[in-house]
């Protein structure tokens, strides 16, 4: 570590420490967190009691992820071959700039773009990039929609607006929609639905992440509850899926294992929707001739982002962080996160966030404060 790096770490730590103290003293954040943590723990316990076998399936999935990372080059090539065989396009992007350049060739100025939740897109700072290109960008996940308009940052891997109580959401929606919106959660959800409907139907491009990608078929797995990802990936003419290399698993069955384990640990007995996407929309209804571009997207673009993941895989200890399913359960069990929300992190949060940050995002200067905040209590395990 150089002297300059030490100086950067000191400066980053000072800013970071101030953010933590401010979060702990913010009554609004503390109210939202206490409600969310209590609700999550209650629901997760119910889900695991109903499906006790999920703990063994998690062990099985760990072996799948370990195998996948050991064979990542081979599996990534297999995904690319399968996607392109089914008339999609696939890029294995070494760095964020490669992914952004590819996306810039797909979208056009003044395009209306709808997005579903994707942490990998956050690695790219994709919204800022698209807006600089002259595009109109709509986050459609309710939590992402809220923080987009608050100009905040995600405060949880799965629930990005976890730090915003319903009263503040009502104030925000009243401002956005030009009318009084009460702090009733059911009403707030309906107002967001109404507001976003127009964007869904006008959008030229839909951008999603992926919970898993099966190499044998090139199939993208998307888990959701709101139904927005189905509209994002089904209505626009172009669909772009952005995923880290670690989302690749060998088979369709492995992808379904990800769905089952991730959704249960995310505290859902069953997700509302699971989408499997393997190609642009197609039909063979006339003379059994397959034609691409039916009711859904005419184009499918899959971007597999490396961004130092292959370097991380070479480290026998740190590569385990890439087994993470992004269910977010560890954060609710953490002794620090319920006090500070996503200020305990740099996009990727909590103890595991220190490792992911060091390799995928800000390097040591951003990772060190997160690592030193961790109490090493082990509750996240």
What are these regions (language model features)?
Residues 292-321, 331, 337-381:
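Ferredoxin-type iron-sulfur electron-transfer modules in oxidoreductases and energy-metabolism complexes
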Residues 2-317, 352:
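The feature marks the mature, well-folded catalytic cores of soluble enzymes
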């Amino acid at each position: 570590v150089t002297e300059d790096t030490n100086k950067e770490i000191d400066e980053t730590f000072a800013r970071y420490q101030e953010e933590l103290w401010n979060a702990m003293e913010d009554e609004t954040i503390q109210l939202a967190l206490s409600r969310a943590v209590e609700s999550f723990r209650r629901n997760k316990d119910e889900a695991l009691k109903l499906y006790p076998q999920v703990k063994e399936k998690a062990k099985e999935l760990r072996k799948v992820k370990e195998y996948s990372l050991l064979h990542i080059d081979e599996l990534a090539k297999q995904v690319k071959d399968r996607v392109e065989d089914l008339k999609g396009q696939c890029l294995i992007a070494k760095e964020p700039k490669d992914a952004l350049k590819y996306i810039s060739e797909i979208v056009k100025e003044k395009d209306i773009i709808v997005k579903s939740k994707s942490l990998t897109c956050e690695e790219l700072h994709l919204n800022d990039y698209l807006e600089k290109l002259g595009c109109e960008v709509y986050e459609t996940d309710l939590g992402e929609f809220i923080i987009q308009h608050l100009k905040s940052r995600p405060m949880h891997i799965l629930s990005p607006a976890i730090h915003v109580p319903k009263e503040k959401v009502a104030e925000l929606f009243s401002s956005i929609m030009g009318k009084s919106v009460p702090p009733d959660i059911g009403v707030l959800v309906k107002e967001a639905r109404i507001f976003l409907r127009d964007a869904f139907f006008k959008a030229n491009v839909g951008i999603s992440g992926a919970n898993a990608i099966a190499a044998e078929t090139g199939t993208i797995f998307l888990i959701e509850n709101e139904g927005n990802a189905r509209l994002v990936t089904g209505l626009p003419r172009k669909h772009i899926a952005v995923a880290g290399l670690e989302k690749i698993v060998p088979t369709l069955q492995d992808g379904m294992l990800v769905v089952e384990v991730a959704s249960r640990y995310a505290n859902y007995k069953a997700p509302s929707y699971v989408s499997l996407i393997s190609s642009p929309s197609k039909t063979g209804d006339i003379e059994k001739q397959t034609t691409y571009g039916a009711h859904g997207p005419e184009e499918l673009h899959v971007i597999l982002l490396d961004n130092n993941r292959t370097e991380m895989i070479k480290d026998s200890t740190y590569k385990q962080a890439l087994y993470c399913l992004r269910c977010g359960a560890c954060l609710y069990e953490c002794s620090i996160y319920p006090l500070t929300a996503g200020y305990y992190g740099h996009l990727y949060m909590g103890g595991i966030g220190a490792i992911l940050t060091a390799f995928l995002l800000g390097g040591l200067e951003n990772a060190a404060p997160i690592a030193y905040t961790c109490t090493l209590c082990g509750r996240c395990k």
